[in-house]
Amino acid sequence: MEQIERIRRMEQLFDLAKEAMEEPVMTPEKYQELQETIAVLSEYYSGKEWKQDYADDEAALLPKDLKRGVLSEDGLWNLLSDWQEAKTRIIIRR
């Protein structure tokens, strides 16, 4: 996957996960989808690609107009940490 395309995709997943975690009640399907999204983001964050994307962002090698919240030092870490708390309070209901 191309770097810019990957960052855009991860940014989209990042935004979707943040929004979904604010919902106090969700269907089992929505909860499963959120878990899968978090798993993809976690794998990205712990892998070489995030480190390279972050380094390239710090070196100003990425387009200035590229949305990059997923590359902030704390953004993705906080989302993954917030997930640990959110999954204890989200009510799953059909």
Spans of features found by a protein language model:
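Long, low-complexity or tandemly repetitive, helically biased scaffold regions used
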Residues: R9-D15, E19-E29, E36-R94
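Extended alpha-helical interaction scaffolds
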Residues: Q3-I4
